[in-house]
Amino acid sequence: MKQFIIDLFKLEKKPVKGLMAYEWVVMAYLLLTLIVIFLMYTTLNNPQAMIFGRLRIVALTAAMWLVYRIVPCRATRFARVGVQLGLLAWWYPDTFEINRHLPNLDYLFAQWEQDLFGCQPALLFSKALPGSVFSELFDMGYAAYYPMIAATAVYYFGWYYKEFNRATFIILSSFFIYYIVFIFVPVTGPTFYYKAIGLQNVTAGIFPNVHDYFNHHQECLPSPGYTDGIFYHLVESAKAAGERPTAAFPSSHVGVSTICMLLLWHDRNYKFLAALAPLYLLLCCATVYIQAHYLIDAIVGFVSACILFAILLRISRKMITK
């Protein structure tokens, strides 16, 4: 521990002069969405706030770069990563401010779900496992999403530092790739769409096009399950704080958590991988159980994560700290 603390604040002999690779990813996404904002300026509800929000992120990124340049050490490197991971909570609802003005596609995904499986798994899963134990387990898995990401980043920082920048590049890149899809493929997920069309239509297999309904309505169904559970309330509180009718396809919960598991597999830390595996499986199941995603979303989230991981791992093969 003593050596770890010493290494934490030991000045680097050859500090990085410019932005880190993951910060360039953030700036690329910021520029892309800024162009979209200007193109849709007269349509968006509050484009000025979106522009100023991006300027603040640029300023914060520059400030963290300056802190690192003044004190170039592992601690300030970690702080730079922590800031960008923390800002994901701002970027997520921002996707809704753009895609709320695009035609909603839930009616297509719900119909594909019906055609593929002959039912709506998001409607039936919780009914098949209604008990408090199952409810709390799935809600616990869903609530473990961000802690799982943080645990992966902290593990690489503390135990596999030479690939810390590489791992954070892969995690943040995958997030922003999913966010681009969320913007241009406006799917809200069952909890919002079922609420909009009524459960009677869902059970009858009728999935009408709601057009721009979610531009004016953000109501969703309460999560199914044991309503007095601790983890149930954690999930509901998170939904109340920042959930928007956006980001259903593909499931980034499944996608990014899969990438975290693959990162642990890449380092061959099978003990940590085995420890997180139950939470990972519960999380993947929970996306459908709590009606946040269609089953299609979860499947594509898993497949896309494997593809993204392979591509990003290859791209980042030179991002290893000597």
Regions found by a protein language model. Give the residues of each.
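Structural signal for the C-terminal ends of transmembrane alpha-helices
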Residues: 65-74, 154-162, 264-268, 310-316
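N-terminal transmembrane-helix/juxtamembrane module of multi-pass inner/ER membrane proteins
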Residues: 2-57, 75-149
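Aromatic-anchored segments of alpha-helical transmembrane domains
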Residues: 31-39, 87-93, 175-183, 280-289
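Hydrophobic alpha-helical transmembrane segments
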Residues: 56-60, 141-153, 176, 249-261
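Membrane-embedded catalytic cores of phosphoryl/pyrophosphoryl-handling enzymes
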Residues: 20, 228-322
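Membrane-interfacial catalytic/cofactor-binding modules of polytopic membrane enzymes
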Residues: 184-266
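Hydrophobic cores of alpha-helical transmembrane segments in multi-pass inner/ER membrane proteins
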Residues: 57-69, 147-152, 302-306, 312
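Interfacial segments of alpha-helical transmembrane regions
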Residues: 78-83, 150-185, 192-205
